[in-house]
Amino acid sequence: MPHVPTVDIRRLGDIRFDTQLERALRPSPDYDVSQWLFVPNQYTEYRYILGTRGQKPLICIGINPSTARPGDLDPTLKSVERVAKANSFDSFIMFNVYAQRATSPDDMERTCNPELHRENMRAFAYALSLNPRPVVWAAWGTIIEKRDYLWPCLEDMIALGREYGARWVTCGRRSKAGHPHHPLYLRADAQAEPFDVEEYVRAQQARAAAAVSGRPRRV
């Protein structure tokens, strides 16, 4: 079943990443915590992290989470797992530019929830800290154009990645607009290639500015 947001995350109580991580590290009746990292550790309106345990994880960045959970991966996550193995990673971490669950990006919040974003960045810092040489796979596709607030969120992630010495990669052909390929429909043996994420953002900013300047002025 697709996930359609029905509850304002602001009403869910304590969404702090540190609190949710502490709970996620405890034994769970629903999955093996020695094999899975799932934060929060129950299905809810947001998700910070879903991944497998290992010493060398590939951090995959999408736009926002859908319905996947430990032991019940959706097609996107199954593809992420295959590509991680094909590129010699022993595990994967699925992360997102924005943490709100919504199967259709059209159902995402119209404005950014600053608390959710702040805690999502704490989650990203944690994911980066799991590997002394973190590798981050840009995999958000064209969906990043769905909400204007996604760009500042991504820029915060890039800044954090810089602090941790992250190496950015992408897989598959980019879109005509230059966006990195979404994990769906990638070959199982798709190889990761270097991705200059800062140059990508500059190019997208220039493209947006050109589009605005080309619009007819209102009289």
Regions found by a protein language model. Give the residues of each.
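Glycine/proline-rich loop-helix segments at beta-alpha junctions forming the active-site rim
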Residues: 2-6, 108-219
